[in-house]
Amino acid sequence: TVSQGVAYTVNKIREHLVAGEGPKLRLLPEQITLEDILSQLPKQHILPRGGGDMILGLEESRLGPLLFNTRTDSHLYLFGDAKTGKTSFLRSIISEITRLYTPREAKIMAIDMRRSLLGAVPEEYTLRYVTNHQDAMKQMREVAQFMRTRLPGSDVTPEQIRNRNWWSGPELWVLVDDYDLVATSSGNPLMDLLDLLPQAGDIGLHVIITRRMGGASRATYEKVLQMMNDLAVTGILLSGNPREGAVINGVKPKRSIPGRAQVVHRELGV
């Protein structure tokens, strides 16, 4: 048979190799835990406080940790089909926030219409946990009003801006699961943050959005997601139908196993 012939040929080639077999190709594991990736990090990355390198996953090209620097980058957005890892991604983000920050250094506001993150945010880190649209509109308006008090005024010196020490308090992480259930015809709570997104690094604001893949290419014209794209925010594409078309920076989704993703970075590409 063909398979027997191929096996015979491979064995003959192996017998005549002078230098022995070459190194085996390393592939991404089917499953990996956050603890597995943490074990690969240098010691100085393990327990920093006040932000730093957040683990997003394992990078395929070098099979090393894929990191997100919270001191230089503020936001993330992710698209994926059902049961491909959207909520698990947010749970990992929550775990990383609690690793990188103390409760005095960071607070989390979660907008979670399906209650998928119920119990995931430690109480000492929770600023708000919102599960309905009306509360989300009200709470986000209040949060945005407070964050505007951190915007640098004319009296703030260039040195203060470099050191970001004209305000004090925790950084705010706004985590939004199922964004398609949040941004509706009844309004979008995140519109209150729209003008703050470009200045987020100055005021300690982080916004992380997950959304289903269906209709993603159309959704990117929605104002908040469009701002994310304009700011060249790192985007993540989990498994999805390629027919959806270009979603992030011209990149189309593709079918893959749960947890496997394309990461679109402004400098590194895909």
Predicted regions and their residues:
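Phosphate-binding and hydrolysis-coupling loops of NTP-dependent motor/remodeling domains
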Residues: 1-60, 65-66, 210-211, 217-270
